[in-house]
A protein has these predicted regions:
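Structural signature of hydrophobic alpha-helical transmembrane segments
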Residues: 416-428, 449, 474, 478
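Adenosine-phosphate binding glycine-rich loop
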Residues: 112-114, 118-156, 161, 282, ...
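Phosphate-binding loop/pocket of nucleotide- and phosphate-handling active sites
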Residues: 343-410
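A structured beta-alpha segment of the ubiquitous adenosine-cofactor-binding alpha/beta core
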Residues: 54-62, 71, 217-248, 252-265, ...
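An N-terminal-biased, well-structured beta-alpha scaffold segment characteristic
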Residues: 5-100
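Small-residue-rich segments of transmembrane alpha-helices in multi-pass membrane proteins
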Residues: 453-463
Length: 505
């Protein structure tokens, strides 16, 4: 079976559906790959690189399976009967294309119709592209912004950090929060789902909650329209933040519907001159009033509104690699025997949800898939408290007295040469107990390095005793070497793992 990789005819599309790395992975599944000449040129993948990876440079329309980024509307007539077309077909917003595909004896799978379930995460193109878009949105904002993101104290004065507001904490929003925070900005984020608050805080952002009485949970994995009460409360929050922040990044999208308006023209008018807004929903109408899809607009009060619709395509090499990997994961699912034979199983909810047309038969829309329905709250059962017997702690003075008496008796019975060692040993125990007991728990792992050195001394001392005494001395020396060696090697292993947490691979 042959897989063909199309070159997108749109001059603004720089991505490609396969890279040399993914071509090698497809070959391991038993497929032959044909790449259209120049398909990866805009993403820095030459035809020679594809050929070295095992692909053939030729006509992809004669292949059994055709990979594409966007639907090849002008080339559908050239697809052979029985061809399987796989790409971002956007069936929710392109009913005309769906009808056109259904009139042809082909099978069409849409990569942007993958259900939001954990088993399908490796195929989720929307998440892959949203991750790139969120990162690129911060890069575009930094390019248009006239100041540092991070605060600085210099000889010329103090530079305040930039304040960034991210509307929506989905995949794109979280990527934007992480990128802006890594540049040193003060990041705030809003989202109608209160459960994402911990994710925002884990990336160093501040979660701004919209206090509303009717926050609902979507059962599809995608955003949903909110109530008028929520929208009114959110509008007041956005209005307050617009006067304060320097950069706003909006990510709110509702599948199959125009993007909701979050930032009005009045809010934009209150923003400071030089502020930047990146509207990531510009392709669907925009979250910001005044956004022009594909263009940059500067308002009368000096606010820059960026409405780029190709943010993932502005990182073409990375976007192509992630998209190609999503396709490879799909082919692994469709090729269970790794024999180069595509098997489409409609009993699999993932494959069923992606299939728009099967052998010329319309299969869109698929049955709904519930992926995140909130479980019903269970009333807590009353638990009868059973009294636990209280153990009286030992008297510290009694314990100290017994220990002192035992030490005194041991010292009195010991040889004179041993008394000094016992005294030092007892003092070391007391001092070590109080020193280690007051060390913060987070520093216990670094203390392993110190204990390695102490255990090493024990090993050396035990080695010196081997062969210089009776069987008892030799036996105790062997036990000491064994136990101390476990501490030494274990300590170094833990220390290595600890240091690896602070290094970049």
């Amino acid at each position: 079976v042959i897989i063909g990789v199309l070159r997108d005819p749109d001059p603004g599309e720089r991505r490609v559906a396969a890279t040399p790395a993914t071509v090698e992975q497809l070959a391991k599944l038993g497929y032959q790959v044909v790449v259209e000449p120049g398909a990866g040129a805009e993403a820095s993948f030459s035809d020679e690189a594809y050929a070295q990876a095992g692909a053939t440079i030729g006509d992809p329309l004669t292949a059994d399976i055709v990979f594409t980024i966007n639907p090849p509307v002008q080339r559908l007539d050239k697809l052979a009967e029985g061809t399987t077309l796989i790409g971002m077909l956007n069936p929710r917003l392109a009913p005309g294309l769906v009808e056109d595909l259904a009139r042809r004896p082909i099978t069409a799978l849409s990569m942007d119709a993958v259900p939001r379930i954990s088993r399908a995460q490796s195929l989720d193109v929307l998440s892959s592209m949203a991750n790139i878009a969120g990162y690129r949105a911060v890069v575009e904002a930094a390019h248009a912004f006239g100041r540092f993101f991070t605060g600085q104290v210099t000889a010329a004065g103090k530079v305040p950090p930039a304040k960034v507001l991210v509307a929506g904490a989905g995949v794109a929003g979280l990527a934007a929060i992480g990128a802006a925070g890594s540049l040193g900005a003060i990041v705030r984020a809003t989202d109608p789902r209160p459960e994402v608050a911990d994710q925002v805080r884990s990336l160093g952002g501040e979660y701004l909650a919209v206090e509303a009485a009717d926050v609902e949970v979507s059962a599809t994995g995608y955003a949903k329209e909110m109530s008028d009460d929520y929208n009114d409360r959110a509008a007041r929050l956005y209005a307050d933040q617009a006067r304060e922040v320097d950069i706003v990044i909006t990510t709110a999208l509702i599948p199959g519907r125009p993007a909701p308006t979050l930032i009005t023209a009045d809010m934009v008018a209150t923003m400071k001159a030089g502020s930047v807004i990146v509207d990531m929903a510009a392709a669907n109408g925009g979250n910001v009033e005044g956004t022009v899809a594909g263009e940059v607009v500067v308002t009368a009060n000096g606010v820059t509104i960026i409405g780029y619709t190709d943010l993932p395509g502005r990182l073409p090499a990375q976007a192509s690699q992630l998209y190609g990997t999503n396709l490879v994961n799909l082919m692994k699912l469709l090729t269970p025997d790794k024999d180069g034979q595509l098997v489409l199983d409609f009993d699999d909810v993932v494959q069923r949800s992606m299939t728009v047309v099967r052998d010329g038969e319309l299969t869109w829309p698929p049955p709904p898939v519930s992926v995140s329905a909130a479980p019903a709250a269970v009333a807590p059962q009353p638990v009868e408290a059973t009294p636990k017997p209280v153990r009286r702690p030992l008297n510290p003075l009694l314990v100290t007295g017994v220990a002192a008496a035992a030490l005194f008796l041991l010292t009195a019975a010991a040889p004179a040469a041993l008394r000094g060692h016992l005294t030092v040993f007892a003092l070391a125990i007391v001092i070590g107990y109080y020193v280690i007991g007051h060390v913060h728990h987070a520093l216990h792992t670094p203390l392993m390095s110190v204990t390695n050195a102490i255990s090493g001394i024990i090993v050396v001392g035990a080695l010196l005793q081997l062969g210089h005494g009776g069987g008892l001395v030799t036996g105790l020396s062997v036990v000491a070497i064994l136990l101390a060696s476990i501490n030494v090697f274990g300590g170094f292993a833990v220390t290595r793992r600890m240091l690896a947490m602070f290094s970049r691979s």
